[in-house]
UniProtKB/Swiss-Prot annotation:
Result, substituting V319I: In a lung large cell carcinoma sample; somatic mutation
Composition-biased stretches (Low complexity): 430-457, 509-533
Gene Ontology CC: cell junction; centrosome; cholinergic synapse; cytoplasm; distal axon; nucleoplasm; nucleus; postsynaptic density
Chief location category: cytoplasm
Effect of K59A: Loss of kinase activity
Post-translational modification: Phosphorylated at Thr-189 by STK11/LKB1 in complex with STE20-related adapter-alpha (STRADA) pseudo kinase and CAB39. Not phosphorylated at Thr-189 by CaMKK2. In contrast, it is phosphorylated and activated by CaMKK1. May be inactivated via dephosphorylation of Thr-189 by PP2C.
Catalytic reaction(s) noted: L-seryl-[protein] + ATP = O-phospho-L-seryl-[protein] + ADP + H(+); L-threonyl-[protein] + ATP = O-phospho-L-threonyl-[protein] + ADP + H(+); L-seryl-[tau protein] + ATP = O-phospho-L-seryl-[tau protein] + ADP + H(+); L-threonyl-[tau protein] + ATP = O-phospho-L-threonyl-[tau protein] + ADP + H(+)
Function: Serine/threonine-protein kinase that plays a key role in polarization of neurons and centrosome duplication. Phosphorylates CDC25B, CDC25C, MAPT/TAU, RIMS1, TUBG1, TUBG2 and WEE1. Following phosphorylation and activation by STK11/LKB1, acts as a key regulator of polarization of cortical neurons, probably by mediating phosphorylation of microtubule-associated proteins such as MAPT/TAU at 'Thr-529' and 'Ser-579'. Also regulates neuron polarization by mediating phosphorylation of WEE1 at 'Ser-642' in postmitotic neurons, leading to down-regulate WEE1 activity in polarized neurons.
Phosphoserine: modified positions: S399, S443, S447, S450, S508, S586, S587, S601
Name this polypeptide is given: Serine/threonine-protein kinase BRSK1
InterPro entries: BRSK1_2-like_UBA, Kinase-like_dom_sf, Prot_kinase_dom, Protein_kinase_ATP_BS, Ser/Thr_kinase_AS, UBA
Domain UBA: start-end pairs: 314-356
Matching SMART domains: S_TKc
Gene this chain is encoded by: BRSK1
C-alpha cells in the first residue's frame, strides 16, 4: 500500500508528532510541508524527488516540472494528466495528492511506492511463474476496467509504467498519454511504444483506445510469462512490420489455457480481440480466484448523483477548468448546454465526479509550514469558493498564511505586508480542483519554442489530432508526442482567466554554468544563465540577438520510442552521490530510470551544427536519409518534414553493456521561410542549418556517428566555404583541405568498424535472442 496519508488534505493534522529527523539539514528545500530529499529518477518532463512531511514523516514522490524549459503543448499534457488523475481513485493506480507551483516550477505531489518498476523487477528476476504473473495481470486488468468505465484510455501501458509497492502490488503510473474516449468516437493519435502498440496504431488508422490497451496488456502478460517480448527487432522498421503481421512464437512452457488468452489479446483484428469483459471471464484469469489476495478485490465504483443544473445556476469554475484541460470539452457553449440538460450524459458524469472529488478532498492553504527563506517558494493550488450541487456559493477557506505572512524576503528582512499581498494575489489566480488545470497554454512562463505537439480535439473525443500526415512505410514510427507543426485542425485552447504569470520576485537563483570546451562542430549548451548562482535569471520573454536561433535549437527532445529489452538490459541503480542531490539543476544525468517514461536530459544539450548552401530542402532530406541507411545498426524515424529521430546500436560485445546513441536531426532555413531561388532557376536553394541534438547515449560515439553522416552530406556537395562556416559557427578551427573527417579516424583502442563513409554490403548477422531460461528463441 501507499505510504501516503489521506489525499489532498486541507491542512496539518490537529496533533503534532516529533520531527522524524531531530537535526534537519540547514539548507533543506521544501515544497509546502514536504522536505525534498534524494532523487528517485529523471523523466522527460522533469525530476522525481522523494518528499518527507516535516511533521508526520509521510513520504511522497514529487515530480518537478520546469515550465521554462518545456513548450506550451507539453505543459498542456501535464495539466491533462493532472485532471485525469483526479478522476481515478483505484488501489492499483498511482494517486495524486496535491499540486504546488511557483514562477519557474510545477510540483506534482504523488503517492510514493518503494518497489520500483515492474521493468526492473523482470530484469532482476527473469520470467515469472504463472501464479505470480496472474496476480500482476489481474491487478492491471482491474485498474484498466475502472479507467475504461470512465472513458479513460491509458495508451502507453508497458512494464516501465507499472510500479510496485512494498507488498509487490501494481500501481499504474504515467497517464501523460491517456485520453478520454467519449461515446463511440475513435482516437487518431499514434502514440505509445512500438513493442507494446497495436497494429492499427502503427498503421496510423483511427482506433478504439480500449482495444489498444488490451493489446498492450497481452504483450505485458507475454513478457511476464516468457521474460522476452513477442515482437522484437534491432531495426525499428522490421519491428513495426512484425507487429503489423502479429505473428509471434508461443513457448511450450506457457499453460494451454493461457496460450488461448494470449492469442485472443494479441489479435491483429481489433473486432476479434478480446474485450475486458471477455478477459475477466476467461478460465485462466478465473483460475486464481481461490488464491487469497485482498488486493485483487474489485474497487468500489464512485457513484455520484447527476442532477440537472438550473439554467441560471452557477457552474464551478475549477471543475470547468479541469474539464477544459481534458481536451474534449473545449466548446464551452455545448458543455454548458449538456450540463443543464435533463438527460444523463458524459459531460455531467465527468462534472459531478470532479465536483465530488473537490468536496471530499478540499485543497486549502497549508498551515504550520516550516520557516522559508526562498525568494519564490512553491505555493499550493487551492480551491476557489466551492459551489454546492444547487449552484450556491459556499464561504471561502483562508489560512493564516494568507492573513498574516511573516516569511522573510530575499534579503532576509521580514516584509509581511508585501508578501501578504503577493500571496493573496497568487491564491486568487491559482485556484483549481486540488491541482486541476490552470490554463497554462497562454502563459508567458512557458518556453517560446515552436510547439512540438499537436493538440486538436477530435469530434467528440479527447485525443490530439494527428498532424504532418502519416509516416512513410520505410520510416514509420510511433511518435510519443505529435509531430512538429500540425494539421489544419489545430487550434489553441481558449484563453484562461488564470493564465497570467504568477506574481513574485524575478526568479530563483540558478546554478552556475561552466564554459564549454569547443571541439570541431560540437557545442555543449551551458546553463540557462551562464552566471554565478546568486544572479537572478533573465526574464523568460527577454532576449538578445540570436533569440530565434536559441528557441529553434532548444526545441524539446522527445525520448526515442521503444523500450530496451528487459531480458537484455541490466538494472540501473543510482550511486550514493547521485541520490544525495537536492536541487533540480544539480541532479544526476544518469539517475535511475524514472517512473514517468523514457528519459532525456533537460539540463544540458550536446549539439552539432552543419550549414549547407545552395541545396534544395528535398535534396538535403534525401542525403540525410541515404546517410542513415548506409550506416549499419542505425535506425531512424520521421518526426516531421524537417525532423528525424535516429538510434545507433554498436554491434559486438554483450549488448547489455552497450548503451545506444539516440539523437534528433532538425533542418532549419537560415534565410527565413522563403529561401532565395537557385541560380539555375530551379528554385528551392538557400542556406540551411542541420542540427544534430544528442538525446541519450555516449557523447563520443555520438560525435563519430554525426561526423560520418556529415562526411556523406558534404561529399555529395563540394562546398569548402560552407564547411568553414560551420566550423566557425561552432567555435572550432577550420579543417585543412583534403583532411579526412574525424569519423574516419577512430580513437586508439576503440575501433568502430561500422562507422564508415561507405555502406557495408549485406545485412548484419542476426543475433539469437535468449530467453531467461537460456533457450534460443527463433
Amino acid at each position: 500500500m501507499s505510504s501516503g496519508a489521506k489525499e489532498g488534505g486541507g491542512g496539518s493534522p490537529a496533533y503534532h508528532l516529533p520531527h522524524p529527523h531531530p537535526h534537519p539539514p540547514q539548507h533543506a528545500q521544501y515544497v509546502g510541508p514536504y522536505r525534498l530529499e534524494k532523487t528517485l529518477g529523471k523523466g522527460q518532463t522533469g525530476l522525481v524527488k522523494l518528499g518527507v512531511h516535516c511533521i508526520t514523516g509521510q513520504k511522497v514522490a514529487i515530480k518537478i516540472v520546469n515550465r521554462e524549459k518545456l513548450s506550451e503543448s507539453v505543459l498542456m499534457k501535464v495539466e491533462r494528466e493532472i485532471a485525469i488523475l483526479k478522476l481515478i481513485e483505484h488501489p492499483h493506480v498511482l494517486k495524486l495528492h496535491d499540486v504546488y507551483e511557483n514562477k519557474k516550477y510545477l510540483y506534482l505531489v504523488l503517492e510514493h511506492v518503494s518497489g520500483g518498476e515492474l521493468f526492473d523487477y523482470l530484469v532482476k528476476k527473469g520470467r515469472l511463474t504463472p501464479k505470480e504473473a496472474r496476480k500482476f495481470f489481474r491487478q492491471i486488468v482491474s485498474a484498466l476496467d475502472f479507467c475504461h468505465s470512465y472513458s479513460i484510455c491509458h495508451r502507453d501501458l508497458k512494464p516501465e509504467n507499472l510500479l510496485l509497492d512494498e507488498k509487490n502490488n501494481i500501481r499504474i503510473a504515467d497517464f501523460g498519454m491517456a485520453s478520454l474516449q467519449v461515446g463511440d468516437s475513435l482516437l487518431e493519435t499514434s502514440c505509445g511504444s512500438p513493442h507494446y502498440a497495436c497494429p492499427e496504431v502503427i498503421k496510423g488508422e483511427k482506433y478504439d483506445g480500449r482495444r489498444a490497451d488490451m493489446w498492450s496488456c497481452g504483450v505485458i502478460l507475454f513478457a511476464l510469462l516468457v521474460g522476452a517480448l513477442p515482437f522484437d527487432d534491432d531495426n525499428l522498421r522490421q519491428l513495426l512490420e512484425k507487429v503489423k503481421r502479429g505473428v509471434f512464437h508461443m513457448p511450450h512452457f506457457i499453460p494451454p489455457d493461457c496460450q488461448s488468452l494470449l492469442r485472443g489479446m494479441i489479435e491483429v483484428e481489433p473486432e476479434k480481440r478480446l474485450s475486458l469483459e471477455q478477459i475477466q471471464k476467461h478460465p485462466w484469469y478465473l483460475g486464481g480466484k481461490h488464491e487469497p489476495d485482498p488486493c485483487l478485490e474489485p474497487a468500489p465504483g464512485r457513484r455520484v448523483a447527476m442532477r440537472s443544473l438550473p439554467s441560471n445556476g452557477e457552474l464551478d469554475p475549477d471543475v470547468l477548468e479541469s474539464m477544459a484541460s481534458l481536451g474534449c470539452f473545449r466548446d464551452r457553449e455545448r458543455l454548458h448546454r449538456e450540463l443543464r440538460s435533463e438527460e444523463e450524459n458524459q459531460e455531467k458524469m465527468i462534472y459531478y465526479l470532479l465536483l465530488d472529488r473537490k468536496e471530499r478532498y478540499p485543497s486549502c492553504e497549508d498551515q504550520d509550514l516550516p520557516p522559508r527563506n526562498d525568494v519564490d517558494p512553491p505555493r499550493k493550488r487551492v480551491d476557489s469558493p466551492m459551489l454546492s450541487r444547487h449552484g450556491k456559493r459556499r464561504p471561502e477557506r483562508k489560512s493564516m498564511e494568507v492573513l498574516s505572512i511573516t516569511d522573510a524576503g530575499g534579503g532576509g528582512s521580514p516584509v509581511p505586508t508585501r508578501r501578504a499581498l503577493e500571496m493573496a494575489q497568487h491564491s486568487q489566480r491559482s485556484r483549481s480542483v486540488s491541482g486541476a488545470s490552470t490554463g497554462l497554454s497562454s502563459s508567458p512562463l512557458s518556453s517560446p519554442r515552436s510547439p512540438v505537439f499537436s493538440f486538436s480535439p477530435e469530434p467528440g473525443a479527447g485525443d490530439e489530432a494527428r498532424g504532418g500526415g502519416s509516416p512513410t512505410s520505410k520510416t514509420q514510427t510511433l511518435p510519443s508526442r505529435g509531430p512538429r507543426g500540425g494539421g489544419a485542425g489545430e487550434q489553441p485552447p481558449p484563453p484562461s482567466a488564470r493564465s497570467t504569470p504568477l506574481p513574485g520576485p524575478p526568479g530563483s537563483p540558478r546554478s552556475s554554468g561552466g564554459t564549454p570546451l569547443h571541439s570541431p562542430l560540437h557545442t555543449p549548451r551551458a546553463s540557462p544563465t551562464g552566471t554565478p548562482g546568486t544572479t537572478p535569471p533573465p526574464s523568460p520573454g527577454g532576449g538578445v540577438g540570436g533569440a530565434a536561433w536559441r528557441s529553434r535549437l532548444n526545441s524539446i527532445r522527445n525520448s526515442f520510442l521503444g523500450s530496451p529489452r528487459f531480458h537484455r538490459r541490466k538494472m540501473q541503480v543510482p550511486t550514493a552521490e547521485e541520490m544525495s542531490s537536492l536541487t533540480p539543476e544539480s541532479s544526476p544525468e544518469l539517475a535511475k530510470r524514472s517512473w514517468f517514461g523514457n528519459f532525456i536530459s533537460l539540463d544540458k544539450e550536446e549539439q552539432i551544427f552543419l550549414v549547407l548552401k545552395d541545396k534544395p530542402l528535398s535534396s538535403i532530406k534525401a542525403d540525410i536519409v541515404h546517410a542513415f541507411l548506409s550506416i549499419p545498426s542505425l535506425s531512424h524515424s520521421v518526426l516531421s518534414q524537417t525532423s528525424f529521430r535516429a538510434e545507433y546500436k554498436a554491434s559486438g560485445g554483450p549488448s547489455v553493456f552497450q548503451k545506444p546513441v539516440r539523437f534528433q536531426v532538425d533542418i532549419s532555413s537560415s534565410e527565413g521561410p522563403e529561401p532565395s531561388p537557385r541560380r539555375d532557376g530551379s528554385g528551392g536553394g538557400g542556406i540551411y542549418s542541420v542540427t544534430f541534438t544528442l538525446i541519450s547515449g555516449p557523447s563520443r560515439r555520438f560525435k563519430r556517428v554525426v561526423e560520418t553522416i556529415q562526411a556523406q552530406l558534404l561529399s555529395t556537395h563540394d562546398q569548402p566555404s560552407v564547411q568553414a562556416l560551420a566550423d566557425e559557427k561552432n567555435g572550432a578551427q577550420t579543417r585543412p583541405a583534403g583532411a579526412p573527417p574525424r569519423s574516419l579516424q577512430p580513437p586508439p583502442g576503440r575501433p568502430d568498424p561500422e562507422l564508415s563513409s561507405s555502406p557495408r554490403r549485406g545485412p548484419p548477422k542476426d543475433k539469437k535472442l535468449l530467453a531467461t531460461n537460456g533457450t534460443p528463441l527463433p
